[in-house]
Swiss-Prot record:
PROSITE patterns: CHAPERONINS_CPN10. The keyword S-adenosyl-L-methionine does not apply. InterPro entries: Chaperonin_GroES, Chaperonin_GroES_sf, Chaprnonin_Cpn10_CS, GroES-like_sf. Keywords: Chaperone, Cytoplasm. Belongs to the GroES chaperonin family. The keyword Cytoplasm applies. Together with the chaperonin GroEL, plays an essential role in assisting protein folding. The GroEL-GroES system forms a nano-cage that allows encapsulation of the non-native substrate proteins and provides a physical environment optimized to promote and accelerate protein folding. GroES binds to the apical surface of the GroEL ring, thereby capping the opening of the GroEL channel. It is found in: Cytoplasm. It comes from Leifsonia xyli subsp. xyli (strain CTCB07). GO terms for molecular function: ATP binding; metal ion binding; protein folding chaperone; protein-folding chaperone binding; unfolded protein binding. Heptamer of 7 subunits arranged in a ring. Interacts with the chaperonin GroEL. This is Co-chaperonin GroES.
């Protein structure tokens, strides 16, 4: 899916992966007890920041990458009826490789 949000500089738009609804033993987890998700799929990537020499520094992630990001990083936004997270590239901790 292509998002019509174009992030600026080193920002990334992420679609969060939903938190588990039940435990391995089948217990339902109430919304108040769920942890904030830290995984998501990259939907859009900015062009990168400009370094001190005026060169553009490309980002290490691409659209479609599954990433793990800082628990409290980013800003939640609603666009086109969908919830997204816009965060800085430095808030991305790792790319999940399968």
């Amino acid at each position: 899916m292509s998002v019509s949000i174009k992030p600026l500089e080193d920002r990334i738009v992420i679609k969060q992966v939903e938190a588990e609804q039940t435990t391995a033993s089948g217990l339902v987890i109430p919304d108040t007890a769920k942890e904030k998700p830290q995984e998501g799929v990259v939907e859009a990537v900015g062009p990168g920041r400009i370094d001190d020499n005026g060169n553009r520094v490309p980002l290490d992630v691409a659209v479609g990458d599954k990433v793990i990001y800082s628990k409290y990083g980013g800003t939640e936004v609603k666009f086109g009826g969908q919830d997204y997270l816009v965060l800085s590239a430095r808030d991305v901790l790792a790319v999940v490789v399968r």
